[in-house]
Amino acid sequence: ECTPDLADDTEATVAQATSLWQRLDLPNVMIKVPATRAGLPAIEELIRRGINVNVTLLFAVDRYEEVVDSYLRGLSARARDGRPLEGIASAASFFLSRIDTKVDARLGENSPLRGQVAIASARVAYQRYLDRFSGQEWERLSGLGARTQRPLWASTGTKNPAYSDLLYVVELI
């Protein structure tokens, strides 16, 4: 995991992630990089270098789309460099319960939307995943050995004691 202090520093994030990757020297490791504004170009560069990335702290579908763009640009750059795409893995981790905690605080106690925004966001994000990892450009990258960047539903334990412990898991199966 990249140090949180570096969340707003692209170059330092890339340097630390590269150092971690080289020291660990394990092909099944993913380096956590936050989905901050500075994290987006870091994700692109790390994928270009062939470093597996778990994008963390995702809360919005719009930012998810930017994360996917960074991933795809990194793969495309790597392919242009004549480097292999096989074996590169990435996940985009949505922090579900944190979304509802933030939104619920702004809703009235009796709002029917309480505990629903994160699930709705995850469903929209999954549809975007299906859309973005299809079509001619994706088929070209896939033909070169690229894998999709998998959505990962993180923070699935509810923070509100009024919600079922399995709220997110059940709704997203």
At which residue positions do the language-model features occur?
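Active-site beta->alpha loop and helix N-cap motifs at the rims of alpha/beta catalytic domains
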Residues: 1-42
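Amphipathic, non-transmembrane alpha-helical secondary structure
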Residues: 11-18, 40, 44, 48, ...
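Acidic (Asp/Glu)-rich catalytic clusters
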Residues: 18-25, 47-48, 82-87
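Catalytic alpha/beta core domains of metabolic enzymes, predominantly
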Residues: 51-172
